[in-house]
Amino acid sequence: MSASRIGLLVCAVAMVAVSATMLAWSVPHLAGYGGGQPFDIRFTGYDHGEAVAFLKALGPDGRAFYDTVQLRLDTAFPILYFVALSWLLAAILGWAGFDGVGRVVVACVVVAVPTLLDFAENAAIRDMLRRAPEAVDADLVARASWYSTRKWSMALVGLTIAALGVAVVLLRRRARTTP
């Protein structure tokens, strides 16, 4: 196995490890404060009232944990996500018959969009966490929620493209083996 493939495998394993850490530990820890799920995983978004209620439920300790632990994990995750999944999507597109640098560009763009939205989401969430709940304005919440919902929507687009690529690979393989 080449050094680049080993590096990509390490990124993929690290991505899964960071994700598992968030899902098994930091997200339940935040939810345990009683205000519901963290902003990052609210697929359908949230409004100003929900955001302020969650920030109040977190209290100072929960907001500090979200800022210093969860958001640090969620800074590592999109970097690892981008490296591992853009490579995987480029490989799937190659197996599906899309040759050349175009497949790499498409893969990178498809994966970069939710990655960049995740970074923007994290910045907006960090801004909310560092304010007193009463000082969090509706515009900031709307922006953070917009980033959250678009991140998940664009990640779903990427998964759909990958699934279509896998379907093309399987159909081509079946066509070659069917008499």
Spans of model-derived segments:
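Hydrophobic alpha-helical transmembrane segments
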Residues: S4-A17, V69-I92, K151-L171
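Alpha-helical transmembrane segments of multi-pass integral membrane proteins
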Residues: V113-L164
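Interfacial loop at the N-terminal end of multi-pass membrane proteins
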Residues: S2-Q70, P133-V136
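Structural signal for the C-terminal ends of transmembrane alpha-helices
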Residues: L89-A96, A167-R173
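Short, charged juxtamembrane terminal tails flanking transmembrane helices
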Residues: R174-P179
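Interfacial segments of alpha-helical transmembrane regions
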Residues: R5-M15, A90, A96-L116
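Juxtamembrane loop-transmembrane helix junctions in multi-pass integral membrane proteins
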Residues: S2-A3, D61, F65-T68, F98-V105, ...
